[in-house]
Structure formats: C-alpha cells, structure tokens
C-alpha cells in the first residue's frame, strides 16, 4: 500500500470518496464525491447527472439510506449535476456559497438551497468542518477544514495530477493564487480533492502549483516583450501541443493571466491586442 493510501486509510471509516466517471465529451475524466462521517453523514458534491443512479445507490449503501447534510464546493456541472437528484432522494437541501447558489439556480431554479459562507461550521457527530472561502476557480468556491486532523475537503482548489482551470469570466487568477497561499498557510497534512487521489504532500503540491503559475506569467511576458500579440497568438506559442479543438481552452487560460497582468498594470489589453507597458 502506498504512503498516500496509508494516510487516507487512517480516515477511511469517516471519509469515503467515490469516483464518478465523466461523459465522453467532458474535459475532466472523472470527479470525486465525498462522504464524511460514520452516522450522521454529510455529502460533498454530486457528480455528473448522467451517473445519477450510481451516485444515489452509493450514498444509500454507505449511509444506510440517511444523509444529514449535502454541501456543494462550487457550481461547475461535474460537481453539481446531481444536486436535484440528491436533494429529492434524501430529502435534504443543498448548502453552498450564495454566489454559487445563484449560478446553479440559473440552470435549475427549483432546487432548495441554504446559503453558507466563510467560517460556517459543518457538524457531523464529533467532526467539525469549517468552511474556508477559496475563490478563483469559481467565484464562490468553498473548501472545508477539519482543523484537529489538518485535513481539507478541497473541491477543485488543489488537484492531484493536474492544474486547476482558471478561466474568465468566472475564474480569477489573482484570487486563485491568494486562495492557494491561504491554504498553504493553514498547513494541511492531507487534502481530499475534487479530482484525483488524496494529496498527502500538500505543502509540496501547493508550492509546485504556485511555481507553475509564476512560470506561465513569465512566459506570457516574454512573448509580449518580443511582439504585441493577440490571446490566440500567445496561446499557440505557449501551448504548442494543443489540438485545434483544444485551443479555445488554452486561449481562456491565457486570458486569465492577461487579466491579472493588466490589473497589476504590467500590460495593456485593448482591441484584442496585448502589449507590455
């Protein structure tokens, strides 16, 4: 058994993760939904709607048909696709940040929500999980902190094997970096992410992600120091291996960097052209 599995297995009686595989056209291959508790139980996120029967069956099996609370880390469809199904099958409302509630209600206005914000405490038996506001990936993204054990239910703030997508208009790179630094300062020893296996080396992983973001910013500035460029030109230079059908995503990633650099008054972005000041 690996070190990661050993660390996660210490808490396997109170934290259970279920991998829900994505539809073929999805960007991510899978998403993790997480149950915390050993009676009562709280569910974090709900997976893709295409797998609603699998999700409901798993929750019913693990909780013996009871679920006390249901919480959404953020509104992206891979996490919120089964909100209505979970609410209906287990007679629970969904808790989420007010910003995320508004975004989900644009798609499904009939869902019952309870708004929660930073410092809200989720009580599950003897476990207390504090809501931590970590915007950037989504504007109302929340993570949940089990302080006594230094364990974080991380949503998409920090992922195991890939970088988190931060794309405008709802993604904000400056806020995302601040959220990474905020979690780093908390000193977690284990993170259960929204995609991938538990992260048993959070400090190393977060520092790697911060370094990666800094490297990307420098690459963008290097491109613009040579030539004023469009977003697409910058994306093609930096993401050389992207297929044409993936380029739009690359352009959006570059746009998040451009918006941060513009806010910091390092560049201008006017009429579709990026230029170093």
Predicted regions and their residues:
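Conserved beta-strand hairpin/beta-sheet module of binuclear metal-dependent hydrolase folds
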Residues: 4-63, 142-160
